[in-house]
Amino acid sequence: MKSVIKRLTILFWAVALCSSVTAQLKRYDTDFLLSRKNFVMTVPIEIERGQIYLSVRMQGRLYRFKLDTGASQGVIYDDVPVRGLRELGYIKSEDAAGQSRQVATVQLPPFALDSLIISGFKVQRMRRSVRREGEDGIIGFALFHRGIAAKINTRDSVMTLTDRRGYFRQAWGEALRYRLKWHVPYVNVSPFAGVTEEVLFDSGSPMLYAINNESLAKMQATVPSVSRQIEGTTYGSHAMGHFGSEHSNKITLLALDSLRWGGFTLQEVHCSTVQGGSHIGAPLLRYGNLIIDPFRKQLIFQPYDGRTSCVVANHRPDIIIVEKRGRAMIGMVTEGGKAWEAGFRHDYVIEKVNGQPLTFDQFNSYQWVRDQEYEFTLRLPIGIATTIRSIWPLQYNQK
């Protein structure tokens, strides 16, 4: 969540820091218990920035979790107070930017998702990469592949959950069989005619589609139509993980004629390359329902109104902001865009706005006034400072 910010991919092998931790990790598993059997229920979901949020009640308090199929288990942020966490030890976790850390694993107290009580759910305890009000953590794909099927309907802001194995057996739609890698779902989509690519379905990513640099290079070498759909290249970084941003690198900008999910075609898709894995993200759910059927290992896309195609015609952001050492940094700037013309360049660190020093979190929550001009104090990679006056909001994307 890759994105932009990616989902946490958990590598399930123990880090033996001491004998007590090792003993705990030998008992660590991803199973959890449900309070009901043979059920079908519909729960409300919230859609914010195109992503899905679930409200749960735990220890008498409401918590709000992002539903992230690119995460295997989930996360509870370390600044969120929760009584009754059970510490399980440490595992090694790798984020969207390819950086890894040892992170604490904890078991949440029982929590209620509508009328369903879930007990024994394990998550990682870690700091948040981007501060967002009203987001306490992440619920990952384990919610489904451990025995719950679901239908996500963002148009009506509801999600159907069931433990009945055959409930979605006769469901219509474009079904893709998924393969679990690192406990998250990968499917084959077609970004170019005659070519398929295995990608992560990552509902935690705000990008409709992102393609790995090396994957694109291999396709370009064998498929003539790929070069025609390249708009240009730039340099920078635009994926943020839980442990930091990816390193600056070449980014290829693409205007795809089509992106095919089975028999459904998304037309005029603007996207770009990433250093991490290729993925298809939350914006897919703007165009239809999605059924997650863990019993048949299928993701079934149901286009709204039964269509076989849609025109996306999405706009690429002029500028992308990432975090570096606690500050907001220009991760990528599209040459010729408004941000480029204003003087912003990749790897410039934003130190002040109107003379006020800002951390990354403060920049992220700054109360911008539309069409107002601001003075930005920037630190260049060579160490010198400069100032730029620009109207905000610039068009930027941040996970």
Summary of predicted features, one role per range:
Residues 1-28:
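Bacterial Sec-dependent N-terminal signal peptides
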Residues 23-399:
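Pepsin/retropepsin-fold aspartyl endopeptidases
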